[in-house]
Design a protein with these regions (language model features):
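Short hydrophobic core segments
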Residues: 7-9, 35, 202-215, 346
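Helical element adjacent to the flavin cofactor pocket in flavoenzyme catalytic cores
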Residues: 147-191, 195-198, 207
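Conserved Rossmann-like nucleotide-cofactor binding loop
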Residues: 14, 40, 215
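Helix-loop-beta segment of a Rossmann-like dinucleotide-binding subdomain
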Residues: 88-102, 114, 121, 126-172, ...
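C-terminal catalytic lobe of FAD-dependent flavoproteins
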Residues: 297-371
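Active-site substrate-recognition segment that forms the wall
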Residues: 20-27, 37, 49-50, 55, ...
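Dinucleotide-binding Rossmann-like beta1-alpha1 core, especially the glycine-rich loop
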Residues: 50-132, 292
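N-terminal Rossmann-like FAD-binding beta1-loop-alpha1 element of flavoenzymes
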Residues: 4-33
Length: 371
Protein backbone atom coordinates (compact mmCIF):
# COMPACT_ATOMS: atom_id res chain seq x y z
CA UNK A 1 0.00 0.00 0.00
CA UNK A 2 1.25 3.46 -0.96
CA UNK A 3 -0.16 6.84 0.00
CA UNK A 4 0.04 10.14 -1.90
CA UNK A 5 -1.68 13.50 -1.98
CA UNK A 6 -2.63 13.15 -5.65
CA UNK A 7 -3.22 9.86 -7.50
CA UNK A 8 -3.69 10.34 -11.24
CA UNK A 9 -5.09 7.35 -13.11
CA UNK A 10 -3.84 7.57 -16.69
CA UNK A 11 -0.57 8.95 -18.06
CA UNK A 12 -1.66 9.98 -21.51
CA UNK A 13 -1.66 13.65 -22.41
CA UNK A 14 -4.46 14.52 -19.95
CA UNK A 15 -2.88 12.79 -16.97
CA UNK A 16 0.61 14.08 -17.77
CA UNK A 17 -0.47 17.70 -18.18
CA UNK A 18 -2.54 17.48 -14.99
CA UNK A 19 0.48 16.21 -13.06
CA UNK A 20 2.66 18.94 -14.55
CA UNK A 21 0.09 21.60 -13.67
CA UNK A 22 0.09 20.42 -10.05
CA UNK A 23 3.88 20.67 -9.99
CA UNK A 24 3.70 24.16 -11.53
CA UNK A 25 1.47 25.16 -8.63
CA UNK A 26 3.95 24.04 -6.02
CA UNK A 27 2.77 20.54 -5.16
CA UNK A 28 5.64 18.32 -4.02
CA UNK A 29 6.26 15.99 -7.00
CA UNK A 30 6.99 13.09 -4.67
CA UNK A 31 3.42 13.36 -3.40
CA UNK A 32 2.02 12.69 -6.88
CA UNK A 33 1.52 9.23 -8.40
CA UNK A 34 0.73 8.46 -12.04
CA UNK A 35 -0.92 5.06 -12.58
CA UNK A 36 -0.55 3.67 -16.10
CA UNK A 37 0.95 0.43 -17.47
CA UNK A 38 2.20 2.24 -20.60
CA UNK A 39 2.66 5.99 -20.06
CA UNK A 40 2.53 8.39 -23.02
CA UNK A 41 0.90 5.83 -25.31
CA UNK A 42 -2.71 5.16 -26.30
CA UNK A 43 -4.59 7.84 -28.24
CA UNK A 44 -1.85 10.38 -27.42
CA UNK A 45 0.61 8.41 -29.54
CA UNK A 46 -1.61 8.68 -32.62
CA UNK A 47 -3.00 12.20 -32.23
CA UNK A 48 -2.55 14.97 -34.77
CA UNK A 49 -1.69 17.63 -32.22
CA UNK A 50 -3.44 20.54 -33.91
CA UNK A 51 -4.13 23.43 -31.55
CA UNK A 52 -6.95 24.57 -33.75
CA UNK A 53 -9.95 26.05 -31.94
CA UNK A 54 -11.19 27.77 -35.10
CA UNK A 55 -10.66 24.95 -37.60
CA UNK A 56 -12.16 22.42 -35.19
CA UNK A 57 -15.46 24.28 -35.11
CA UNK A 58 -18.42 21.99 -35.75
CA UNK A 59 -22.03 22.98 -36.14
CA UNK A 60 -24.19 22.44 -33.03
CA UNK A 61 -21.17 22.15 -30.74
CA UNK A 62 -21.28 25.67 -29.32
CA UNK A 63 -20.34 24.65 -25.73
CA UNK A 64 -16.97 23.43 -27.04
CA UNK A 65 -15.89 26.72 -28.63
CA UNK A 66 -14.97 28.67 -25.47
CA UNK A 67 -13.21 25.64 -23.99
CA UNK A 68 -11.06 25.17 -27.09
CA UNK A 69 -10.24 28.87 -27.33
CA UNK A 70 -9.27 29.13 -23.67
CA UNK A 71 -7.13 26.01 -23.86
CA UNK A 72 -5.27 27.20 -26.95
CA UNK A 73 -4.49 30.45 -25.14
CA UNK A 74 -2.91 28.48 -22.28
CA UNK A 75 -0.48 26.59 -24.51
CA UNK A 76 2.32 29.19 -24.95
CA UNK A 77 2.94 29.44 -21.20
CA UNK A 78 2.55 25.68 -20.73
CA UNK A 79 5.14 24.95 -23.41
CA UNK A 80 7.45 27.69 -22.11
CA UNK A 81 7.38 26.27 -18.57
CA UNK A 82 7.99 22.75 -19.85
CA UNK A 83 10.97 23.84 -21.95
CA UNK A 84 12.30 25.87 -19.00
CA UNK A 85 12.16 22.72 -16.87
CA UNK A 86 14.17 20.81 -19.49
CA UNK A 87 16.27 23.27 -21.53
CA UNK A 88 16.79 22.20 -25.12
CA UNK A 89 13.59 20.16 -25.19
CA UNK A 90 11.71 20.20 -28.50
CA UNK A 91 7.99 19.51 -28.23
CA UNK A 92 7.24 20.32 -31.86
CA UNK A 93 5.39 23.51 -31.00
CA UNK A 94 4.86 25.53 -34.18
CA UNK A 95 2.97 28.77 -34.62
CA UNK A 96 2.61 29.08 -38.39
CA UNK A 97 -0.94 29.83 -39.45
CA UNK A 98 -3.17 27.03 -40.73
CA UNK A 99 -4.60 26.86 -44.25
CA UNK A 100 -7.99 25.22 -44.79
CA UNK A 101 -8.63 24.37 -48.44
CA UNK A 102 -11.47 23.08 -50.61
CA UNK A 103 -10.90 20.53 -53.36
CA UNK A 104 -13.95 21.24 -55.53
CA UNK A 105 -16.87 23.64 -55.86
CA UNK A 106 -19.09 21.80 -53.42
CA UNK A 107 -16.26 21.79 -50.88
CA UNK A 108 -15.76 25.52 -51.52
CA UNK A 109 -19.42 26.12 -50.68
CA UNK A 110 -19.01 24.14 -47.46
CA UNK A 111 -15.83 26.06 -46.61
CA UNK A 112 -17.55 29.40 -47.24
CA UNK A 113 -20.48 28.46 -44.99
CA UNK A 114 -18.11 27.25 -42.28
CA UNK A 115 -16.11 30.48 -42.51
CA UNK A 116 -19.29 32.51 -42.07
CA UNK A 117 -20.14 30.39 -39.01
CA UNK A 118 -16.65 31.01 -37.61
CA UNK A 119 -16.97 34.75 -38.21
CA UNK A 120 -20.31 34.70 -36.38
CA UNK A 121 -18.45 33.41 -33.33
CA UNK A 122 -15.75 36.07 -33.61
CA UNK A 123 -13.00 33.82 -34.95
CA UNK A 124 -10.12 35.19 -37.00
CA UNK A 125 -10.40 33.52 -40.41
CA UNK A 126 -9.17 35.19 -43.61
CA UNK A 127 -10.13 34.28 -47.17
CA UNK A 128 -7.23 33.95 -49.60
CA UNK A 129 -7.07 33.62 -53.35
CA UNK A 130 -5.43 30.45 -54.58
CA UNK A 131 -2.59 32.56 -55.97
CA UNK A 132 -2.02 34.13 -52.55
CA UNK A 133 -2.04 30.73 -50.87
CA UNK A 134 0.32 29.14 -53.40
CA UNK A 135 2.73 32.06 -53.12
CA UNK A 136 3.24 30.92 -49.50
CA UNK A 137 2.75 27.19 -50.08
CA UNK A 138 3.68 26.32 -53.68
CA UNK A 139 3.17 22.64 -52.90
CA UNK A 140 -0.60 23.14 -52.91
CA UNK A 141 -2.45 21.84 -55.94
CA UNK A 142 -3.30 24.52 -58.53
CA UNK A 143 -6.72 22.84 -58.90
CA UNK A 144 -8.06 23.79 -55.46
CA UNK A 145 -11.37 25.63 -55.32
CA UNK A 146 -10.94 27.71 -52.17
CA UNK A 147 -8.56 28.62 -49.34
CA UNK A 148 -8.84 30.33 -45.96
CA UNK A 149 -6.09 31.15 -43.48
CA UNK A 150 -6.46 30.85 -39.71
CA UNK A 151 -3.65 32.79 -37.99
CA UNK A 152 -4.35 31.48 -34.48
CA UNK A 153 -4.41 27.74 -35.20
CA UNK A 154 -1.05 26.15 -34.36
CA UNK A 155 0.33 22.68 -33.54
CA UNK A 156 2.37 20.59 -31.12
CA UNK A 157 3.88 17.14 -31.71
CA UNK A 158 1.94 14.89 -29.30
CA UNK A 159 4.64 12.22 -29.07
CA UNK A 160 7.40 14.72 -28.34
CA UNK A 161 5.19 16.73 -26.00
CA UNK A 162 4.10 13.69 -23.97
CA UNK A 163 7.65 12.30 -23.85
CA UNK A 164 8.96 15.64 -22.57
CA UNK A 165 6.28 15.82 -19.88
CA UNK A 166 7.07 12.28 -18.79
CA UNK A 167 10.82 12.96 -18.58
CA UNK A 168 10.36 16.14 -16.56
CA UNK A 169 7.88 14.56 -14.16
CA UNK A 170 10.10 11.54 -13.57
CA UNK A 171 13.15 13.77 -13.06
CA UNK A 172 11.28 15.87 -10.50
CA UNK A 173 10.25 12.79 -8.55
CA UNK A 174 6.67 12.00 -9.55
CA UNK A 175 6.05 8.31 -8.86
CA UNK A 176 5.15 6.18 -11.88
CA UNK A 177 3.06 3.13 -11.04
CA UNK A 178 3.34 1.10 -14.24
CA UNK A 179 0.34 -1.13 -13.59
CA UNK A 180 -3.25 -1.23 -14.78
CA UNK A 181 -5.80 0.49 -12.58
CA UNK A 182 -8.62 -1.64 -11.26
CA UNK A 183 -11.50 -0.48 -9.11
CA UNK A 184 -11.64 2.86 -7.37
CA UNK A 185 -11.46 2.63 -3.59
CA UNK A 186 -14.16 4.23 -1.47
CA UNK A 187 -14.77 5.00 2.18
CA UNK A 188 -18.42 5.89 2.30
CA UNK A 189 -18.99 8.60 -0.31
CA UNK A 190 -15.31 9.57 -0.53
CA UNK A 191 -12.86 8.18 -3.06
CA UNK A 192 -9.59 7.28 -1.35
CA UNK A 193 -7.55 5.83 -4.21
CA UNK A 194 -7.43 2.95 -6.66
CA UNK A 195 -6.50 -0.72 -6.84
CA UNK A 196 -3.67 -1.60 -9.23
CA UNK A 197 -2.27 -4.78 -10.76
CA UNK A 198 -3.39 -8.37 -10.53
CA UNK A 199 -2.71 -8.39 -6.80
CA UNK A 200 -5.07 -5.43 -6.30
CA UNK A 201 -2.50 -3.39 -4.42
CA UNK A 202 -3.88 -0.19 -2.96
CA UNK A 203 -2.60 3.20 -4.08
CA UNK A 204 -4.22 5.72 -1.77
CA UNK A 205 -4.59 9.44 -2.34
CA UNK A 206 -6.22 12.47 -0.77
CA UNK A 207 -7.46 13.24 -4.29
CA UNK A 208 -7.85 10.79 -7.16
CA UNK A 209 -8.05 11.87 -10.81
CA UNK A 210 -9.63 9.77 -13.58
CA UNK A 211 -7.68 10.66 -16.74
CA UNK A 212 -7.38 7.29 -18.46
CA UNK A 213 -9.59 7.77 -21.51
CA UNK A 214 -11.55 4.66 -22.42
CA UNK A 215 -10.00 2.87 -19.46
CA UNK A 216 -12.32 4.87 -17.23
CA UNK A 217 -15.13 2.52 -18.24
CA UNK A 218 -13.63 -0.14 -15.98
CA UNK A 219 -13.65 2.06 -12.88
CA UNK A 220 -17.36 1.79 -12.13
CA UNK A 221 -18.31 5.38 -12.92
CA UNK A 222 -21.47 6.36 -14.86
CA UNK A 223 -19.55 7.50 -17.93
CA UNK A 224 -20.97 6.83 -21.39
CA UNK A 225 -17.70 6.40 -23.29
CA UNK A 226 -17.29 4.71 -26.66
CA UNK A 227 -14.19 4.05 -28.79
CA UNK A 228 -14.01 6.08 -32.01
CA UNK A 229 -11.13 4.75 -34.09
CA UNK A 230 -9.00 7.03 -36.20
CA UNK A 231 -6.47 5.96 -38.84
CA UNK A 232 -3.39 8.16 -39.19
CA UNK A 233 -0.27 7.97 -41.37
CA UNK A 234 3.29 9.14 -40.84
CA UNK A 235 5.23 10.02 -43.97
CA UNK A 236 8.87 10.88 -44.50
CA UNK A 237 10.37 13.33 -46.97
CA UNK A 238 13.81 14.86 -47.43
CA UNK A 239 12.06 18.20 -47.91
CA UNK A 240 8.52 18.69 -46.68
CA UNK A 241 6.25 19.87 -49.53
CA UNK A 242 4.38 22.22 -47.16
CA UNK A 243 5.52 24.34 -44.23
CA UNK A 244 2.34 24.60 -42.19
CA UNK A 245 -0.74 22.60 -41.25
CA UNK A 246 -3.00 22.10 -44.27
CA UNK A 247 -6.55 21.02 -43.56
CA UNK A 248 -8.82 20.16 -46.46
CA UNK A 249 -12.28 19.11 -47.51
CA UNK A 250 -12.14 16.65 -50.39
CA UNK A 251 -15.60 15.67 -51.62
CA UNK A 252 -16.81 16.53 -48.12
CA UNK A 253 -14.20 14.28 -46.46
CA UNK A 254 -11.85 16.03 -44.02
CA UNK A 255 -8.11 15.40 -44.21
CA UNK A 256 -5.15 17.09 -42.55
CA UNK A 257 -1.48 17.30 -43.48
CA UNK A 258 0.89 18.26 -40.66
CA UNK A 259 4.62 18.88 -41.23
CA UNK A 260 6.59 18.12 -38.05
CA UNK A 261 9.81 19.56 -36.69
CA UNK A 262 11.27 16.03 -36.72
CA UNK A 263 11.00 15.87 -40.52
CA UNK A 264 7.93 13.65 -40.67
CA UNK A 265 4.49 14.49 -42.01
CA UNK A 266 1.28 13.36 -40.33
CA UNK A 267 -1.75 12.64 -42.50
CA UNK A 268 -5.11 11.92 -40.94
CA UNK A 269 -7.57 11.07 -39.82
CA UNK A 270 -10.50 8.79 -40.37
CA UNK A 271 -13.33 8.41 -37.89
CA UNK A 272 -14.96 5.01 -37.62
CA UNK A 273 -16.81 2.93 -35.06
CA UNK A 274 -16.15 -0.63 -36.16
CA UNK A 275 -14.32 -3.72 -34.92
CA UNK A 276 -11.09 -3.33 -36.93
CA UNK A 277 -8.31 -2.78 -34.41
CA UNK A 278 -5.58 -2.28 -37.01
CA UNK A 279 -5.36 0.44 -39.68
CA UNK A 280 -8.19 0.00 -42.18
CA UNK A 281 -7.19 -0.45 -45.83
CA UNK A 282 -10.02 1.74 -47.10
CA UNK A 283 -9.10 4.44 -44.60
CA UNK A 284 -5.41 4.41 -45.49
CA UNK A 285 -6.24 4.49 -49.21
CA UNK A 286 -8.67 7.39 -48.82
CA UNK A 287 -6.26 9.42 -46.68
CA UNK A 288 -3.43 9.04 -49.18
CA UNK A 289 -5.64 9.75 -52.19
CA UNK A 290 -7.17 12.87 -50.65
CA UNK A 291 -3.89 14.20 -49.26
CA UNK A 292 -2.14 13.78 -52.63
CA UNK A 293 -5.00 15.55 -54.36
CA UNK A 294 -4.36 18.55 -52.10
CA UNK A 295 -0.53 18.37 -52.06
CA UNK A 296 0.56 16.33 -55.11
CA UNK A 297 4.22 16.04 -54.04
CA UNK A 298 3.18 13.82 -51.14
CA UNK A 299 3.19 10.89 -53.57
CA UNK A 300 7.00 11.09 -53.52
CA UNK A 301 7.15 10.59 -49.74
CA UNK A 302 7.93 7.39 -47.87
CA UNK A 303 5.23 5.71 -45.81
CA UNK A 304 6.83 5.30 -42.39
CA UNK A 305 3.89 4.15 -40.33
CA UNK A 306 0.16 3.49 -40.44
CA UNK A 307 -1.53 3.77 -37.06
CA UNK A 308 -4.94 3.58 -35.47
CA UNK A 309 -5.98 5.19 -32.21
CA UNK A 310 -9.05 4.75 -30.04
CA UNK A 311 -10.45 8.12 -29.09
CA UNK A 312 -12.81 8.28 -26.09
CA UNK A 313 -16.07 9.67 -27.42
CA UNK A 314 -19.14 10.82 -25.49
CA UNK A 315 -22.75 11.17 -26.71
CA UNK A 316 -22.46 14.96 -27.04
CA UNK A 317 -18.73 15.12 -27.90
CA UNK A 318 -18.03 17.13 -24.74
CA UNK A 319 -15.51 15.82 -22.22
CA UNK A 320 -16.39 14.58 -18.78
CA UNK A 321 -14.72 17.23 -16.64
CA UNK A 322 -15.61 17.93 -13.04
CA UNK A 323 -16.08 16.31 -9.67
CA UNK A 324 -17.22 12.70 -9.84
CA UNK A 325 -17.62 12.36 -6.10
CA UNK A 326 -15.93 13.46 -2.92
CA UNK A 327 -12.15 13.69 -3.50
CA UNK A 328 -12.59 12.47 -7.09
CA UNK A 329 -11.81 14.53 -10.20
CA UNK A 330 -12.96 13.19 -13.58
CA UNK A 331 -11.13 14.41 -16.70
CA UNK A 332 -11.73 12.12 -19.67
CA UNK A 333 -13.81 11.70 -22.83
CA UNK A 334 -11.98 14.35 -24.86
CA UNK A 335 -12.67 12.57 -28.19
CA UNK A 336 -10.79 14.34 -31.04
CA UNK A 337 -9.75 17.27 -28.87
CA UNK A 338 -7.52 15.67 -26.26
CA UNK A 339 -4.33 17.49 -27.22
CA UNK A 340 -6.05 20.84 -27.75
CA UNK A 341 -8.03 20.65 -24.50
CA UNK A 342 -5.21 19.20 -22.38
CA UNK A 343 -4.03 22.58 -21.10
CA UNK A 344 -7.51 23.57 -19.98
CA UNK A 345 -8.28 20.11 -18.61
CA UNK A 346 -5.10 20.27 -16.54
CA UNK A 347 -5.97 23.70 -15.18
CA UNK A 348 -9.49 22.70 -14.21
CA UNK A 349 -8.31 19.38 -12.80
CA UNK A 350 -5.70 21.10 -10.63
CA UNK A 351 -8.23 23.70 -9.50
CA UNK A 352 -10.64 21.01 -8.36
CA UNK A 353 -7.96 18.78 -6.87
CA UNK A 354 -6.55 21.65 -4.83
CA UNK A 355 -10.05 22.60 -3.64
CA UNK A 356 -10.04 25.89 -5.50
CA UNK A 357 -12.85 27.51 -7.46
CA UNK A 358 -12.21 27.19 -11.17
CA UNK A 359 -12.74 30.20 -13.42
CA UNK A 360 -13.65 27.93 -16.34
CA UNK A 361 -17.32 27.31 -17.06
CA UNK A 362 -17.59 23.52 -17.12
CA UNK A 363 -21.31 23.29 -16.41
CA UNK A 364 -21.93 21.44 -19.68
CA UNK A 365 -19.20 18.87 -18.93
CA UNK A 366 -20.56 17.31 -15.74
CA UNK A 367 -19.43 13.69 -15.28
CA UNK A 368 -22.91 12.60 -14.19
CA UNK A 369 -24.85 14.12 -17.10
CA UNK A 370 -25.43 10.79 -18.87
CA UNK A 371 -26.46 8.70 -15.87
Amino acid sequence: MSTYEHVIVGAGIIGLTTAFELVRRGVDPQRIALVDPAPASGATNVAGGMLAPAAEVQYRQEPLYPLMLQSAELYPSLVADLVAAAPGTDVGYRTESTFVVAADRADATHLRELTEHQHTHGMDVDRLTLRQARSQEPGLSPQLAGVVEIPGDHQVNPRMFAAALLRVLEYKGVRLVREKAGALLWEGSACVGVEVGVDKRKVLGATTYVCNGLGARALGLPLNLRPVRGDMLRLGAANAPVGRVIRAFVEDRPVYIIPRTDGTIAVGATSREDARERPAVDGVYTLLRDAIRVVPALEDCELIEALVGNRPGTPDDLPYLGLGGENLVVSTGYFRHGILLAALGARVGADLGLRRTTAVDIAACGPARHE
